[in-house]
């Protein structure tokens, strides 16, 4: 039958038979132009099976420290017409950070924005001047919704404590930032019934001022671990990740502790948080699913229920959450999973049903994506954040830089220019001099470690300048009347003392008795130091009797160094016209001057604007040297996903410079990469594998040597190199990753091509790589693109695409184009009249790319899956647009059917939108607008009755 004609005719007859009704704008569609609602493959990061069930861990990718909120469909700020969930997660040093993820069913999630573009402009956040923020930055964020406003609170370990960000529009911003200027461990924000804001941190609670800027009440250690020993059968330790929820008459606070079974949920409850009411506790060991949220679900009958949303360590992929259904007993305690038994790979029925087309769409949304770098992502409001007061270079008198500032430091003119500090005697000696003909003997120091030589530096010292000091020292003498035989070595300092008595040590060194020793060091004078009246002094460390020994000193030197410090500039963070997909994050702050999607259309350009560091140290604890790769700026990465993960990219390396290395890396502190390296004009393709071992340890496990040979760490592995011909400027690299979450191991096989068609193995399989448990990076493996310089800046590499697949070359499967052909056929069958023009145009662009991919005789499954999944996702979006009638909300937020949110009944909530009702014969009845039928409408109806379908009436956007 002609579905289009029958449907229009029935509608037109209904209009003609009803006086005073105007033809309502509605979608028009035909049998051969309807996108299928047959479930497509789920995204790489979903465990939604498509049959109404899902498994845990749920997202198959790294989403730690989760905090989840629900915005009810009845909320005036909800424009989606159905319950919406938002989630935030830890991203530490990555930029942008604090991703806001969205879901309609608590199982399928996608990123809609970030809270901030960069967390600070500090050296540590920007990999500047040898500093870094690995394992630091943003930790354990808390997301809350209160009185129409959204709040995110998180702590930082290296950026002056905790911050609160808030906005009235969580998906579009802008966000306002508040610095609390103090730290809280794993803080969670909570608004009490009077609307007062509180921070929950472990077993501590703090009330904030109404403007959220100040702590006005502190209640610490309100409970103790010991009081729960009987309830839990063990004494809990930790109390991390506490979040508080009011459910019925009780306040429930899930927290985690390390119990005898491992990561364990302790659920606390009380009728009042602070009035002394008893806190009860219940222990849940849920297969190591622990820290996270309780989430509320509409039961469809006017009631709601609460369920668990906790994550577990699932390396090498990362820390992955799971939605764990709960039933609540008459005692007011939840029972999670199967009688509180939960295991990885458990399968559950989904708690929220969605209409078939919307279900098909959200299953394809992902936290990772392929990308062809077409600069077609929308500009985000967080990119425009300009909160920064940038550090500026000091104003320096260059005539005092690079010259010796100490007068008579070799004492060839005796004691001229020198005066004793804290008494003591200064004597020029020639017998036993350390250098030249004369040295200085320092005697009669008494009990003063500060007794020694001093010299005025007034008019010579400058704020913000780094100085290098040195001195040669020897001591042989025992002090008169004091047994100092036990003092075999002692610390000496060359220091700057300011007029107010403050002392900054410039050079520090240990001098052994009887050994002539030169101590050296550097120090940067603070920018706010009062340098007027300052002087250079020599001291020994404060110590026991016998440490104010006589000594001889010579060649005291102090030189101001030329400023080699790199200072931030506004161009680093100002938008550069390039907009990346939201799945991408930079390792630390990017420098926007040195990456682009516009310099070469359809390519990502990474330019080396900085050189990597050969001296940088890990800054969070004592975890040793950083590799070159770890100090490379503008490393662009995505999450990995568990199981088989293949990434393919195409690089143009024609503009590399000597000392440059560029490629594709899978990394945490341990890493592997395939890259092109240029040395002495010759480019070589190779593989690097770096396994971090926490340094050299003694028998007790203490780190005794945490230094590395950086060149050796990133040398190409034997048997894994290819010398590139001079004309080989295009290189294709494929990284086939196997992330085995059961064993915790990652293995990688690299492949390469020089023509994009014929592929060869690049070395042997690399691995296994594991998680080092030092918490130094503290995240699952990431995978991304990089380019770094050791010798020269200015070289650049262009990346054509980033194509994902879950099929590995080593699987031995032929390239399968059937799904790509099916998507193309489906797209070709559609008619533009039924869809919003902007979404239709997106589909046409993706259809063209899909056809080009098919015509190119693809050589890998990546080259098929990337365009197929992109096109299939857009077809699913069109199906939702068709059902909603106007496509007003990407993701189906303006649906005419609400779905069965509880699995009970058949809700058809309209989200406040006017709908057509459905008759038994599947025709659509027309809704009344209270307007008269105009001649134009009557003409349109006449044409419809005649079977003429060339006229299209589209719903106007609202």
Across the structure, where does each feature detected by a protein language model lie?
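Beta-rich interaction/scaffold domains
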Residues: 813-893, 936, 944-946, 951-953
